[in-house]
Amino acid sequence: MMEKKKALLLGDYTDAPWHPLEPARVELEAILGEAFELTATEDYDVLLRLQTEAGGYPLCIAYTDCWNRELTKAQTAGLLRYVAGGGGLLVIHNGISLQCSYELLQMIGAEFTGHPPYQKLRYSRTAEAQGHPLLEGVEDFVLDEEPYLFAPDPFVERRIFLEFEFEGNRLPAGWEHDYGLGRVVYLQPGHHAPSFRPAPYRRLIRNSASWAAAGRVESTLG
């Protein structure tokens, strides 16, 4: 049996205005449990130790709901060091609330600008990303979800692999890019537990976690 990799899930149990961590934790444990040993926490100070903890975490998953507060400078620096040094960062839905720090906004690759009402959305793979390992075994899918909208960071070369249809337009719903020696993936769906249940999206989450985690494995970190 292949040894499981360690993954850190960061979110908010007690101070989550819209997206509490526990429902997402249950779903992610079911999706990733065969390949990852998942540790969930709402202690943002864990970011200070990501580079140095014994054994380390090849993957950090952000499901943070910190829209109304900023990370400390030390917490921000810890996450930046971790990813630049080879750690993988998977940001799901409201995890983009880390944009409260402009440095983290740039690392994620875009700014959340708002969302129209919750509604049925059709998600599809982009033509440009056909053959990307993130899309292996992933079919198009339909999901009731919050249509998060974004303004791209002009200095980040994102590779968009997932889109959703909204008012006659096809808009980004998933992208990836390198950051130093690390890899960053953003996935838009994830408002609540049912968001995680379509089989194609579960496969996409598994692919994204494995792909992002490989950045650290292939880095020069000791």
Residue spans for each PLM region:
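Short, glycine/charged-enriched secondary-structure capping and boundary segments
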Residues: 22-25, 74-78, 104-107, 175, ...
